[in-house]
């Protein structure tokens, strides 16, 4: 009777759960939680079981996709180019794309395709402040940068991209302050700084009505969002078929608004995901 039941339960507790068909991963920021949710949903709707591993660091998730402990996640071309390939040049958006895809192939990682949006660094200002100073591009900052203050996330001012921007435009700001990301946006919104290094699909760009400045000298890298798959997952035609529908399906603005729902409006990832699915141009 009861003893048998206890023994039974004890044994049952020792049986490992079967591994999900696919492990979907993501890094620790809103856009990545949304994209991991999207990948998982697409695979689940196709009948696969999925485990999500969220909040993984860049280097960790990249290692995991190479050795197959993770099957799929969304990466950015600029991250692979600068961090994993350690390249300091900027051959432009297409040059980076092809360089990155080729490099990943050698690493046993398959590029399923590009999602359609890019989340790159851009210098941004309050629209009214930019108008007041007559600024629409980084070139317009050259004569006035020495009187302006700039804010960035914790790493931008230490990156090759900033050094390239500084050198190509031959300018520097009077003050350079670093902030936690959300505080960086508040700082520019509240006029504590004139310019920030924004992320182009960040919802706060829309919420605070920031103007993204053009970069005519191509100082800043392209960061196309790309779906990466492990060798094992990529060898399964149905898996590739399912994710192929996501290629070129998400415009920048749709991603920005989905991020805004979470970061500004306080909605759940689920709500943002539903919104995004409604905005997608499915193949």
Name each region found by the language model.
Residues 21-51, 55, 116-186, 190, ...:
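Bilobed "Venus flytrap"/periplasmic-binding protein-like clamshell domains
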Residues 113-114, 169, 199-201, 216, ...:
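Soluble extramembrane regions of membrane proteins in the secretory/endomembrane system
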Residues 19-22, 35, 61-72, 76-77:
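Accessory recognition modules or surfaces
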Residues 54-58, 68-81, 96, 181, ...:
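Beta->alpha turn/N-cap motifs
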């Amino acid at each position: 009777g009861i003893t048998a039941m206890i023994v039974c339960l004890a044994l049952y507790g020792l049986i490992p759960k079967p591994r999900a068909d696919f492990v979907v991963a993501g890094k620790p920021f809103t856009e990545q939680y949304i994209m991991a949710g999207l990948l998982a949903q697409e695979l689940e709707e196709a009948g696969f079981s999925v485990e999500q591993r969220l909040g993984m660091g860049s280097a960790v998730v990249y290692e995991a996709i190479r050795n197959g402990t993770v099957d799929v996640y969304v990466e950015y071309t600029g991250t692979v180019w600068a961090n994993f390939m350690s390249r300091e040049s900027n051959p432009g958006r297409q040059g980076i794309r092809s360089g990155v895809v080729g490099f990943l192939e050698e690493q046993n990682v398959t590029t399923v395709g590009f999602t359609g949006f890019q989340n790159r660094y851009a210098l941004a200002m309050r629209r009214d402040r930019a108008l007041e100073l007559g600024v629409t591009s980084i070139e317009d900052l050259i004569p006035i940068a020495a009187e302006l203050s700039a804010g960035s996330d914790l790493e931008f001012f230490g990156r090759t991209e900033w050094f390239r921007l500084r050198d190509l435009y031959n300018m520097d700001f009077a003050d350079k302050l670093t902030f936690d990301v959300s505080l960086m946006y508040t700082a520019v919104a509240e006029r504590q700084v004139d310019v920030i290094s924004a992320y182009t699909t960040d919802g706060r760009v829309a919420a605070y009505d920031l103007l993204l400045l053009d970069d005519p000298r191509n100082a800043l890298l392209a960061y196309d969002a790309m779906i990466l798959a492990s060798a094992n997952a990529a060898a399964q035609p149905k898996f590739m078929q399912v994710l192929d529908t996501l290629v070129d399906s998400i415009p920048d603005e749709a991603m920005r608004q989905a991020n805004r729902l979470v970061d500004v409006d306080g909605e759940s990832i689920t709500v943002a995901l539903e919104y995004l699915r409604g905005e997608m141009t499915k193949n």
